[in-house]
Amino acid sequence: MSDQFDAKAFLKTVTSQPGVYRMYDAGGTVIYVGKAKDLKKRLSSYFRSNLASRKTEALVAQIQQIDVTVTHTETEALLLEHNYIKLYQPRYNVLLRDDKSYPFIFLSGDTHPRLAMHRGAKHAKGEYFGPFPNGYAVRETLALLQKIFPIRQCENSVYRNRSRPCLQYQIGRCLGPCVEGLVSEEEYAQQVEYVRLFLSGKDDQVLTQLISRMETASQNLEFEEAARIRDQIQAVRRVTEKQFVSNTGDDLDVIGVAFDAGMACVHVLFIRQGKVLGSRSYFPKVPGGTELSEVVETFVGQFYLQGSQMRTLPGEILLDFNLSDKTLLADSLSELAGRKINVQTKPRGDRARYLKLARTNAATALTSKLSQQSTVHQRLTALASVLKLPEVKRMECFDISHTMGEQTVASCVVFDANGPLRAEYRRYNITGITPGDDYAAMNQVLRRRYGKAIDDSKIPDVILIDGGKGQLAQAKNVFAELDVSWDKNHPLLLGVAKGVDRKAGLETLFFEPEGEGFSLPPDSPALHVIQHIRDESHDHAIGGHRKKRAKVKNTSSLETIEGVGPKRRQMLLKYMGGLQGLRNASVEEIAKVPGISQGLAEKIFWSLKH
């Protein structure tokens, strides 16, 4: 423990009420956040002679200050604790490295409802089905639904401005409600109801109704209609036969855990209406010496209680581990949801099968992750040896992308001991330079990236500059001129240039802009990690450049029209479904856009035509 922190004097001031405490190191950084039913009793336990673990010993040795926040209840303390953990990301807490809201399938409340993927707050009028584990699962489900139940998935701005059916109608993926006379209101509403039942897990009702309609059509000698409905029935059956369905039809989240070699995997199965919608594996950041019980307890708390995560709480949560705070967690979740949430650890029947499945998936994912980590570790060790460094814990790589000097974008990608750290990838729009001047672009991005305060844990060991000697010279100049508090001499600057044939394996590396570079054997693990991060940076830069170029392409034609500012451009593109839709629109259609007069509509029409 630090000599400067007087634990005895501090503990005399602490209350015995429930609350949250924050521990700080000498640099004023929060290193641990915890909660307690009795703050005095809990904090006193840190300053006993016989501490429970090495992790606690290491934590206490760094304490310089402790702040406490008193709360009314233990539930309030639990919620505040996880909000503080999310805010401060303390190094001695187990951290859930995921900050994305889960996607849902949204069925709008329009006259002719549409299906779409939705993330975030649920403000729009309509119904939400999910959550799904990722965007891919939603897109796959939407594609499947479009084949079985052809209701529209287009934006309202496109739907409102159609005068003839689109390609989706031609290939049988949409009933074409945008054009009058193609589908009756009753038929469209019926298909929407099928979608609603299907997404609610009521497949049997869908099949019963479809079979009844097929028989009616057949009796009325409407054989084409009967055949179409028969195909729908077969498609629904093919989908439902592939999935294990629980007899309960309940909404569950099932959480399985695996722990090995200091790494934890938490696997979550999302079950709605008795069906597995999907699953996802998480690898929380676990400080050394952490017990499995703390990993599970902290993960579950962060997963459900951090407000910005937009989690949808099921009626029941099945856990692979018995928690000491299970009752407190259930009460907190129930209070948050405004209804009863059950937390169970010893399920039976179908629930036990789900828990076994989650546990198996967690173990499999952890084995795969450890194998991948071992490969990355070997490559980074080899790279450290080549570069004569003690170790390489963090690498950053930069690349520049543009088209004939326009829409220049720089990318920065980050690797740590586990490989790509995609949450820390960044793109930088480059402005104020001569078009096509890659050196100036590199100079600008490096100054923006490193010309500011950086946490010690974020200082890279190696900075890879894609582009060879010239780009490396720019990097050296930038670092020589940096006026920063962190150790700017710590990162090793390394230039990488492709060979004459620009083939993988023929790269040349440079420590200095002058003189000859050196190459590594094609089978070198060190070269492989360099190629990996260089390719990631290249792809990230190109992706950003393409987005920027597409944005300019969609707006540049309008920017030259007098009277059409940013807000009107946005409104025009939104209502017309993009620039192409606007080009195809008549004067009368353009004039229907809010804020566009008849005179301005004529000006826009003729400007785009000529």
Swiss-Prot record:
Pfam families for this protein: GIY-YIG (PF01541), HHH_5 (PF14520), UVR (PF02151), UvrC_RNaseH (PF22920), UvrC_RNaseH_dom (PF08459)
Top-level taxon of origin: Bacteria
Subcellular location: Cytoplasm
GO CC terms, sorted: cytoplasm; excinuclease repair complex
The entry's keywords: Cytoplasm, DNA damage, DNA excision, DNA repair, Excision nuclease, SOS response
GIY-YIG domain mapped to chain residues: 16-94
Keyword check for NADP: no
Any single biological process term in GO: SOS response
All copies of domain UVR, residue ranges: 204-239
GO molecular function list: DNA binding; excinuclease ABC activity
Disulfide bonds listed in the record: none
Annotated HAMAP family: UvrC
Record's subunit section: Interacts with UvrB in an incision complex.
Family as reported in the entry's similarity comment: Belongs to the UvrC family.
Role noted for this protein: The UvrABC repair system catalyzes the recognition and processing of DNA lesions. UvrC both incises the 5' and 3' sides of the lesion. The N-terminal half is responsible for the 3' incision and the C-terminal half is responsible for the 5' incision.
Protein name in the entry: UvrABC system protein C
Gene that specifies this protein: uvrC
